[in-house]
Amino acid sequence: MAGLKLQAVTKSWDGKTQVIKPLTLDVADGEFIVMVGPSGCGKSTLLRMVAGLERVTTGDIWIDRKRVTEMEPKDRGIAMVFQNYALYPHMSVEENMAWGLKIRGMGKQQIAERVKEAARILELDGLLKRRPRELSGGQRQRVAMGRAIVREPAVFLFDEPLSNLDAKLRVQMRLELQQLHRRLKTTSLYVTHDQVEAMTLAQRVMVMNGGVAEQIGTPVEVYEKPASLFVASFIGSPAMNLLAGRVNNEGTHFELDGGITLPLNGGYRQYAGRKMTLGIRPEHIALSSQAEGGVPLVMDTLEILGADNLAHGRWGEQKLVVRLAHQERPTAGSTLWLHLPENQLHLFDGETGQRV
């Protein structure tokens, strides 16, 4: 077991523009961290820096309390699993898993023991003599993981390993990865653009945007208390409703640009009169009535999802999505009366986009 530390690391391709801005991350022994963000946010570049495949411009990387910033990849004690399985087509499953150990000069008996144990963990025992072309996508990905496991690394690095699989296989492999981590307890850094993978696999999530770590926290923390407008809009499906407006002069209500006024749960007097963005998740909006002081929304569209439904409407020019129970199926053009609980409202600074 070993920890991983990134200390103020940066990356610049041209010496001027930083594609990774100063970033610090401490990963505890045995912790599973997922880096999630849109394409081009820097997550794969950061992973390659940890692996030693990209040079660190400034800052340091530590693995198992050893500074590895200038070390060759083979000396860092890491093993990578990629999006592409990169299996040798002419080799059997057993030979693919053993190859890395063989070229390092490990003895035949020790190699056989490690391959046998990895195959047992990954339920590949009956497939060891098969070639990659005889395997399904999920089985090939397990072989790629087995090749990493036999190395007994200090840190696993996963670069979007499930993105080539179909939806059903991705669900299965997510469960297998969770079970694998519980069994091995190896420190892991995992890259994905898929927020479902991030939320289900991670002990902590690092949400990245434009080379910056917007927020680092548990899946529950980043979902329930997003640190910025970006995190609020990226995490959650459908995304959090974000509504522009201002805090009234008394700091007691939020005035939407569409003329709707919503009560605030106190503590916002210091923001009186300021432009802000209000956020609320679709599932936190409750149906109410006009008599109960509900806020009206004319529904444009209803998405029927099976377990629940999504009602889409507008307040002025601003879109609003409401998650409804599966038996609630209003028709387009009907008016919904809504209650937005004060304790479920989020406020973000109108200039910085940061949570207040």
Swiss-Prot record:
For this entry, the protein name equals: sn-glycerol-3-phosphate import ATP-binding protein UgpC
GO cellular component labels? ATP-binding cassette (ABC) transporter complex, substrate-binding subunit-containing
EC code: 7.6.2.10
Could you tell me the gene encoding this protein? ugpC
Listed binding positions for ATP are 37-44
The record's keywords, sorted A to Z, are: ATP-binding, Cell inner membrane, Cell membrane, Membrane, Nucleotide-binding, Sugar transport, Translocase, Transport
Record-stated family: Belongs to the ABC transporter superfamily. sn-glycerol-3-phosphate importer (TC 3.A.1.1.3) family.
Q: Which reaction does it catalyse?
A: sn-glycerol 3-phosphate(out) + ATP + H2O = sn-glycerol 3-phosphate(in) + ADP + phosphate + H(+)
This chain's function reads: Part of the ABC transporter complex UgpBAEC involved in sn-glycerol-3-phosphate (G3P) import. Responsible for energy coupling to the transport system.
Q: What's a Pfam family in this record?
A: ABC_tran
The record's Gene Ontology biological-process terms are: carbohydrate transport; glycerophosphodiester transmembrane transport
Which CDD domains does the UniProt record give?
Answer: ABC_MalK_N
Q: List the molecular function annotations (GO) for this entry.
A: ABC-type glycerol-3-phosphate transporter activity; ATP binding; ATP hydrolysis activity
All copies of the ABC transporter domain together span: 4-235
Q: Which organism is it from?
A: Escherichia coli O1:K1 / APEC
Q: How does it sit in the membrane?
A: Peripheral membrane protein
The leader peptide range reads: none
The domain of life is Bacteria
Quaternary structure? The complex is composed of two ATP-binding proteins (UgpC), two transmembrane proteins (UgpA and UgpE) and a solute-binding protein (UgpB).
- The reply on keyword Membrane is yes
User: What is the enzyme's main class?
Assistant: translocase
Q: Which InterPro entries match?
A: AAA+_ATPase, ABC_transporter-like_ATP-bd, ABC_transporter-like_CS, ABC_transpr_MalK-like, ABC_transpr_MalK/UgpC-like, Mo/tungstate-bd_C_term_dom, NA-bd_OB-fold, OB_MalK-like
Subcellular location field: Cell inner membrane
